[in-house]
Amino acid sequence: MPPLILASASASRAALLTQAGLDFVRIPADLDEDAVKDEGLARGSSPKAIAITLAEAKALHVSARHPGIVIGGDQVLQLERDLISKSRSMDEARDLLTRMSGKTHYLHAGMALAENGHLLWSNAESAEMSVRPLSPAFIDAYLQKTGDKILSSVGCYQLESEGVHLFDAIRGDYFTVLGLPLLPLLAQLRHYGMSLA
């Protein structure tokens, strides 16, 4: 059986695969993600299509250099008409949380499988995230509690920890919110001979 490789630096994606009992190695793709996003936007691609394109680019990049089946994954946050990138500072995080307060945004999680530089499969799932109204005092307390670790998450939250306090409704798959729609991915891995038994 060929090795399984995760082409992502995401700790949450790695944790999901580990918790699912998969043996894999992590080899993050060295890509200019902003350039891929900008190219997709220039072509008029939807946010969901951009998430797929990012996942495919990561999987193809790593699979061209390393033998095995490679999982690429990426997540795009759509707020109104904008695609949101990770905040680079706590001030940017505060501004984003203020902007998201009382609004609904969408997480589009793309995933792809590639082997030997050839795409095997790709897909994306979406989740609708309704943020409750957040007071400035709550935002400050939240950022103080989470610290700068929150800058590693595109929406400045991790649903599996303190981030759950931001929401009053979520529609969509939990794994999609965490950045890797696990059930369709596991089905494809079984199709390619990767399973527990």
List each language-model region with its residue ranges.
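Short beta-strand-to-turn element immediately C-terminal to the catalytic PLP-Schiff-base lysine
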Residues: Q78, A112-E115, R132, A169
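Active-site oxyanion/phosphate-handling segment shared across diverse enzymes
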Residues: S122-L196
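Active-site-adjacent loop/tail segments of enzyme domains
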Residues: Q75-H105, V131-P133
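Residue-level signal for inorganic ion chemistry
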Residues: L17, A55, D74, A93, ...
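Anionic-ligand binding region
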Residues: G110-S122, S126-A127
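N-terminal polybasic phosphate/anion-binding patch
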Residues: M1-I69, L83, A137, Q144, ...
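Alpha-helical membrane segments and adjacent membrane-interface helices in multi-pass membrane proteins
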Residues: I69-Q75
